[in-house]
Amino acid sequence: MLALCFRAGLARYAIAAREVVEVLPRVVLRPVVHAPAAVQGLLGFRGMLIPVVDLVNLLDGGVCPARLSTRLIVVQAPFFSPARTGVRYLALMAEGVTDLIKSEQTRPGLKISAARYLGEHLVDIDELPQLIVASEILPESLSELFCEVDEGQA
């Protein structure tokens, strides 16, 4: 498996390369007033507005630092509205996005019902990065928030 590694706080995580649409540098985002702390803003991407979620905030409770290695990882995520089908884009802000790694062995981690996005660990890589399942990353509260963005681009 090929995976893109990043950091959230002190832990190392990865997203399967097949889930990554594009990796972008950190750019100025359109702020969203009164949004939850994990929502960094909206990004213009391929003629659409897509939400940007701070993975450090979501996974660790901190704030993603502004470093040269901070990137926006654009992934596909399912529509949040039951009336819509297909996929949409979502940008995940992460730090330390510098390594594309190949791993041959994965092992399950702890199953945490509140964190369905946490996947298996890459056991043949230093620091045992844990896979993030992009389609499960948004908690229900954020999924509901983005329904309106989905509907506005129909």
Task: Map each language-model feature to its residues.
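An acidic, low-aromatic, low-complexity terminal/linker signal
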Residues: 1-154
